[in-house]
């Protein structure tokens, strides 16, 4: 029976092609389904998918959250959990309606109503599934495993019934109420917005800032002074109802000799400017209460007396004049104050943002555009004191970007303020990544919580399940079954959307009323839909009761940082309102993805990266790695072809090249893992070091992912892969050529473990490596890396002392390379010796000495102390930057002591740790970074020192060393020729060479056995080659010509 063998691994890899092959493998072998089946019965680890809306095409930013929503479920599955992954679609809401309105060429609600609500909603239903194929393609292509065959949809009747049930629960708690309040209103869409929607749409604009005279008509100043009032919304002056003054603020009369104006005392100079003096007359706001004034416009009628000074605690003296114009139809504080005084609420602006047609001057004008006409009229009538452009942040609709107005009208609210303390308590239990969000962005949001404006005067959404009769009785319905009982007809197949639900009436069931109850016309905020997904995705409580209860709350959710005002908030709010418990325990907030130029991706800038072409150019693994580990996930990051290609070059290709190297030499030598391989304890020190580092890596990566830190996990893995390739493999290359079982077994174990560790981050390339290097040679191995378990770190196998020694070895090698480069002696030229001075060298494992001598290409290695005399002239001076922090003004005295000390003794002491000097009779201890040591090599030596370590190279090159150097030059040339001839690395060759340089002839003759061994030559001889040999290779610097052929 043929022994197991690695599959052949190509040296060059086409990552996108590899990934498409892996996708085929997953699909054909149903690997995702098997991962779910395999983990059935294990502890649940619950993840919720935040539903996207598929009425638009996905962009590169959609990849980001999906990466995190795939990495952690894969990781937890490998850790022994069952992780169900149910996809979902967000179907309702204003964004969908706006897109359909645009398609149909509509300009507002009146067009929709004329077209027909049923027809319009049918178009909405069609639009939200229009691009599901594109989202599913993205999901599949990037390797995001989620169940697309059974997704939840917020528009499905069963989902809506669950939402109704939750609203009835809230209603029964007295927390779903109707109130007349001022709330954000979009005049384009003619609907209200919730506070969390409002937070998503601020834009910087310039508004007119006007100071207006309100002549007093009663009180001690009547007829001889005016109140000076400041506002940035001149259009609201049409419905001015009162002027608010703080009861405890002192207001003064100021004059310029021509008129008198009343302003708050602290604001005289700021509001009036130069040339104004106070008259000495002062009044508190309380004393001014009910002074009447002439209103700025008489364009609308008032049904009751108004236009006098009222007192309000919210008035400040930070800006303006300390007197605040009140228009209760357009301001929350205004409405509250005016209600206390019984003042009327007059609203001349229609729901589309235009003034009523019969309003003089501005009838039919959009509220923002009315400012100019009104300001001009105030100017003409002598009421405008001054007009200054004012730049500020103003709320706009987060979808259509229309300027919002605050609008008083009856709406339905969820009293989230009643559960504010519970929300704060649940937030304390939640783990936020980054942690700063808990008490920062999200905590502030909860602390400033306002009631949730739930109702929307729109069409495509979950209908508000409230029916009311003429007597004002309210009935909240929780299901279609309940509706069937109330109507006495079967409503089980009813489409619960408008307009069908609007036609359902029943006899009011309350107190024997019996009057006809009709549904209120509103739908609900679509954010409530998505916030209900933990239970509504299962149709709870009408089915899947046990399933939901086993999967609530989620252990993990992840979306972009702006969802602190969106889904993160609504999930916590709905969960707390309905179940008295937040819907999640751990949440990863992600920064936004920017274009490579640092700007936001947008169509008009032409900098959008299409996700599928991006992955088909660089590979999904590279994009995933960048999203997960290319910088802090919670900071805004720039993504482009350059950043993705860097991931390919630095990490993925390094990993692949190591795998290809292992496969090549294992196949060449016919090796496969077996019990006959040397045990770890019997392997060379370099192998033992690598295995120790592997177990440390496994422990650290596990901790990082347990802490939701993909950046740290990625950094650890990338650094390890680099060390693996550029230190271990490079230092062990000769052993692999020789088929060394210890080296092959060690690298196999490392590749298998690293492949498992990388699998959640880069599922494609690791799958291919598993199929090529693990599955074929490992009896009982799972058929996919994603069916494998997570590696367990053996902490007892970690050797901190060996790790410390290898750090020292590599540090000395780095110093040796640096001093050789500075000397100009090329690396291939052997030198006789290197001398080392550093703490810990004496205890260094003798095997590690060989690593240093081979790397530095020296014959011997010894401690500098073993050689008599010094190889350098040493000077020492104070590092003022470091010492200044410790000694301040006393640094000069320390510097003088350092300059006067024995520099060589200081250098020696600092290598061991610290040094000391006498300063004004006291001993001062100095650290290595506080003294600058300069060592000038003696002639014939090259010396490099850094932080207490010194490496010296003896530069004397004997004839024997020179010949060895020439031999190494020849080896390099022949190896290049082998590569260019298309030979396999294991192919044996025959070679003939000639040279006109006596030194070269002597060198190649003396070292012929070494050269032949290095270049795999079975026949290496001086002389002319016959026609069976290939084309000649010539190197003029060596006066060397050679020809080779396969042996």
UniProtKB/Swiss-Prot annotation:
Localization of this protein: Cytoplasm
Needed co-factor(s): Zn(2+)
GO biological process terms held by the UniProt record: isoleucyl-tRNA aminoacylation
Gene Ontology cellular-component annotations: cytoplasm
Keyword ATP-binding (UniProt): yes
Alphabetized GO MF terms: aminoacyl-tRNA deacylase activity; ATP binding; isoleucine-tRNA ligase activity; tRNA binding; zinc ion binding
InterPro entries: aa-tRNA-synth_Ia (IPR002300), Anticodon_Ile_ABEc (IPR033709), Ile-tRNA-ligase (IPR002301), Ile-tRNA-ligase_type2 (IPR023586), M/V/L/I-tRNA-synth_anticd-bd (IPR013155), Rossmann-like_a/b/a_fold (IPR014729), tRNAsynth_Ia_anticodon-bd (IPR009080), Val/Leu/Ile-tRNA-synth_edit (IPR009008)
Pfam family, one: tRNA-synt_1
Amino acids binding ATP: 603
Main localisation: cytoplasm
Keywords: Aminoacyl-tRNA synthetase, ATP-binding, Cytoplasm, Ligase, Metal-binding, Nucleotide-binding, Protein biosynthesis, Zinc
EC number: 6.1.1.5
Placement of sequence motif 'HIGH' region: 52-62
Motif ('KMSKS' region): 600-604
Enzyme class: ligase
Catalytic activity: tRNA(Ile) + L-isoleucine + ATP = L-isoleucyl-tRNA(Ile) + AMP + diphosphate
Entry text on domains: IleRS has two distinct active sites: one for aminoacylation and one for editing. The misactivated valine is translocated from the active site to the editing site, which sterically excludes the correctly activated isoleucine. The single editing site contains two valyl binding pockets, one specific for each substrate (Val-AMP or Val-tRNA(Ile)).
Task performed by this protein: Catalyzes the attachment of isoleucine to tRNA(Ile). As IleRS can inadvertently accommodate and process structurally similar amino acids such as valine, to avoid such errors it has two additional distinct tRNA(Ile)-dependent editing activities. One activity is designated as 'pretransfer' editing and involves the hydrolysis of activated Val-AMP. The other activity is designated 'posttransfer' editing and involves deacylation of mischarged Val-tRNA(Ile).
Family membership: Belongs to the class-I aminoacyl-tRNA synthetase family. IleS type 2 subfamily.
PANTHER family listed in its UniProt record: ISOLEUCINE--TRNA LIGASE, CYTOPLASMIC, SOLEUCYL-TRNA SYNTHETASE
Subunit structure comment from the entry: Monomer.
Protein name: Isoleucine--tRNA ligase
Gene expressing this chain: ileS
């Amino acid at each position: 029976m043929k022994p197991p063998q690695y599959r052949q691994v190509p040296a060059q890899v086409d990552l996108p092609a590899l990934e498409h092959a892996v996708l085929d493998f997953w699909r054909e072998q149903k690997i995702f389904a098997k991962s779910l089946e395999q983990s059935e019965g294990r502890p649940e680890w619950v993840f919720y998918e935040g539903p996207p809306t598929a009425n638009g095409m996905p962009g590169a930013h959609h990849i980001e959250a999906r990466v995190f929503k795939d990495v952690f479920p894969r990781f937890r599955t490998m850790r022994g959990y069952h992780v169900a992954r149910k996809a979902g679609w967000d179907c309702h809401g204003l964004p969908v309606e706006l897109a359909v309105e645009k398609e149909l060429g509509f300009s507002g609600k009146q067009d929709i109503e004329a077209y027909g609500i049923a027809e319009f909603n049918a178009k909405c239903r069609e639009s939200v599934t229009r691009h599901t194929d594109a989202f599913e393609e993205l999901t599949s292509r990037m390797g995001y495993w989620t169940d697309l065959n059974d997704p939840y949809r917020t528009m499905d009747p069963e989902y809506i019934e669950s939402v109704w049930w939750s609203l009835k629960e809230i209603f029964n708690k007295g927390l779903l109420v109707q109130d007349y309040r001022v709330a954000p209103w979009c005049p384009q869409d003619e609907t209200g917005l919730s506070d969390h929607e409002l937070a998503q749409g601020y834009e910087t604009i310039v508004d007119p800032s006007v100071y207006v005279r309100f002549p007093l008509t009663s009180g001690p100043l009547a007829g001889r002074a005016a109140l000076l009032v400041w506002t940035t919304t001149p259009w609201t002056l049409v419905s001015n109802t009162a002027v608010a003054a703080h009861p405890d603020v002192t207001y003064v009369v100021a004059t310029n000799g021509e008129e008198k104006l009343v302003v708050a005392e602290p604001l005289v100079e700021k509001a009036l400017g130069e040339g104004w003096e106070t008259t000495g007359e002062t009044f508190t706001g309380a004393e001014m209460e009910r002074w009447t004034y002439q209103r700025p416009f008489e364009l609308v009628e008032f049904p009751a007396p108004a236009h006098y000074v009222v007192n309000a605690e919210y008035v400040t003296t930070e800006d303006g004049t300390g007197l605040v114009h009140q228009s209760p139809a357009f301001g929350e504080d205004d409405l509250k104050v005016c209600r206390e005084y019984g003042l009327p609420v007059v609203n001349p602006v229609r729901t589309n943002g235009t003034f009523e047609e019969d309003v003089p001057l501005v009838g039919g004008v959009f509220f923002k555009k009315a400012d100019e006409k009104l300001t001009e009229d105030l100017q003409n009538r002598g009421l405008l004191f001054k007009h200054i452009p004012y730049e500020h942040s103003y709320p706009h609709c987060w979808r259509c970007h229309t300027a919002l107005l605050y609008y008083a009208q009856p709406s339905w609210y969820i009293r989230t303020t009643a559960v504010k303390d519970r929300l704060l308590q649940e937030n304390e239990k939640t783990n936020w990544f980054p942690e700063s969000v808990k008490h920062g962005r999200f905590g502030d949001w909860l602390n400033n919580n306002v009631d949730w404006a739930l109702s929307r005067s729109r069409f495509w959404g979950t209908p508000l399940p409230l029916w009311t009769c003429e007597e004002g009785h309210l009935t909240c319905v929780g299901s279609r079954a309940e509706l069937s009982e109330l109507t006495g007809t079967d409503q089980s197949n009813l489409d619960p959307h408008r307009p069908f639900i609007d036609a359902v009436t029943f006899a009011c069931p309350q107190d024997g009323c019996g009057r006809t109850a009709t549904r209120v016309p509103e739908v609900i905020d679509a954010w409530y839909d998505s916030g209900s997904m933990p239970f509504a995705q299962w149709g709870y409580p009408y089915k899947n009761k046990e399933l939901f209860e086993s999967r609530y709350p989620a252990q993990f959710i992840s979306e972009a940082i702006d969802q602190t005002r969106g889904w993160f908030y609504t999930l916590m709010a709905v969960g707390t309102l309905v179940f008295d418990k937040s819907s999640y325990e751990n949440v990863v907030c992600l920064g936004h993805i920017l274009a490579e130029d640092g700007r936001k991706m947008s169509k008009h800038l032409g900098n959008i990266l299409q996700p599928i072409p991006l992955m088909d150019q660089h590979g999904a693994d590279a994009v995933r790695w960048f999203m997960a580990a290319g910088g802090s996930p919670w900071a805004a990051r720039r993504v482009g072809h350059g950043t993705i290609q860097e991931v390919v070059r630095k990490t993925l290709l390094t990993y692949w090249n190591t795998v290809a190297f292992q496969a090549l030499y294992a196949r060449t030598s016919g090796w496969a893992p077996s019990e006959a391989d040397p045990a770890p304890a019997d392997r060379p020190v370099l192998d033992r070091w690598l295995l120790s580092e592997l177990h440390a890596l496994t422990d650290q990566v596990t901790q990082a992912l347990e802490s939701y830190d993909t950046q740290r996990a990625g950094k650890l893995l990338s650094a390890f892969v680099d060390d693996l390739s550029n230190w271990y493999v490079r230092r062990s290359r000769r052993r692999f050529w020789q088929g060394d079982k210890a080296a092959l077994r060690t690298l196999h174990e490392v590749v298998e473990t690293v492949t498992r560790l990388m699998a959640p981050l880069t599922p494609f390339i690791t799958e291919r490596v598993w199929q090529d290097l693990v599955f074929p040679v490992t009896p009982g191995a799972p058929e996919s890396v994603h069916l494998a378990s997570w590696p367990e770190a053996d902490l007892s196998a970690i050797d901190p002392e060996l790790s410390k020694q290898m750090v020292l070895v590599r540090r000395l090698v780095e110093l040796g390379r640096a001093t050789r480069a500075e000397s100009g002696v090329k690396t291939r030229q052997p030198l006789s010796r290197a001398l080392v001075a550093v703490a810990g060298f004496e205890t260094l494992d003798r095997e590690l000495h060989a690593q240093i001598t081979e790397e530095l290409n020296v014959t011997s290695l010894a401690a500098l102390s073993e050689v008599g005399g010094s190889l350098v002239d040493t000077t020492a001076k104070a590092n003022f930057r470091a010492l200044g922090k410790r000694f301040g003004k006393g640094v000069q005295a320390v510097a003088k002591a350092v300059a006067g000390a024995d520099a060589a003794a200081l250098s020696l002491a600092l290598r061991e740790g610290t040094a000391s000097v006498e300063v004004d009779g006291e001993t001062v201890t100095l650290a290595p970074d506080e003294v600058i040591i300069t060592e000038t090599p003696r002639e014939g030596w090259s010396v490099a020192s850094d932080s207490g370590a010194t490496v010296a190279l003896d530069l004397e090159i004997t004839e024997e060393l020179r010949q060895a150097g020439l031999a190494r030059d020849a080896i390099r040339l022949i190896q290049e020729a082998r590569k260019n001839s298309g030979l396999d690395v294991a192919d044996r060759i025959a070679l003939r060479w000639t040279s006109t340089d006596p030194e070269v002839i002597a060198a190649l003759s003396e070292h012929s056995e070494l050269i032949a061994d290095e270049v795999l030559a079975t026949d290496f001889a001086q002389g002319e080659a016959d026609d069976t040999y290939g084309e000649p290779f010539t190197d003029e610097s060596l006066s060397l010509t050679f020809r080779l052929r396969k042996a």
